[in-house]
Design a protein with these regions (language model features):
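Acidic, mature catalytic/reactive cores of soluble proteins
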Residues: 1-189
Length: 189
């Protein structure tokens, strides 16, 4: 598992480049769906540019590895840098819907790959929230327990923690999650 996560960290510069090609900035990362060198190799547009929930599972895997092994050094040395880049992607990918007064994520393909180009896939929106929460939680933990690594991460990522954390918290608090209130269930999109 650690080798797979190291692979993702090693591919971070290409993931940032992939996101930059799509108009994202400031170190936002979009990891490829299919690759052998970090560049996107998948030819289906709907999967390549809409199945973006894949970013969140990378963050989830980083956190699960650290929690299950007790190896917080990994997050301090490698994982948090990836988590920040993915959170920056989401910060730029969401849109604020005035009618809903919520953040929305438009034009995605969910993990079942059944419906393409849908708005507000529940899994994608929910996992975005969880990604941002995990990044915030581990930023605070690393700042307290690994101050030297925290300073290094802030320097290499050019992190404006006050500004970026405020934005991420706002998204967490105001993300739209589709639901059928009458039946008390979340709907796919």
């Amino acid at each position: 598992a650690k080798n797979l996560l190291a692979y993702r960290h090693n591919q971070l510069p290409k993931a940032i480049e992939n996101a930059r090609k799509l108009g994202f900035k400031d170190g936002a990362a979009l990891f490829p769906q299919v690759t052998n060198n970090g560049e996107e190799c998948h030819s289906e547009w709907e999967i390549t540019f809409e199945e973006i929930h894949r970013n969140n599972i990378i963050v989830y895997a980083i956190v699960q590895h650290a929690v299950l092994t007790g190896n917080m050094d990994y997050i301090a040395q490698y994982g948090l840098e990836v988590m920040i880049a993915v959170s920056r992607f989401w910060s730029q990918r969401v849109s604020f819907s005035q009618p809903k007064q919520k953040y929305v994520i438009l034009g995605v393909t969910g993990p079942d790959e059944y419906e393409n180009n849908v708005d507000n896939n529940w899994y994608t929106n929910y996992s975005c929230i969880q990604c941002l929460k995990m990044t915030l939680r581990f930023l605070e933990m690393i700042a307290q327990q690994y101050p030297d690594e925290y300073a290094r991460i802030r320097r290499i990522t050019n992190l404006d923690q006050v500004k970026e954390s405020a934005r991420w918290r706002d998204i967490i608090e105001h993300m739209y999650l589709p639901e059928d209130k009458e039946r008390g269930i979340f709907i796919q999109n």
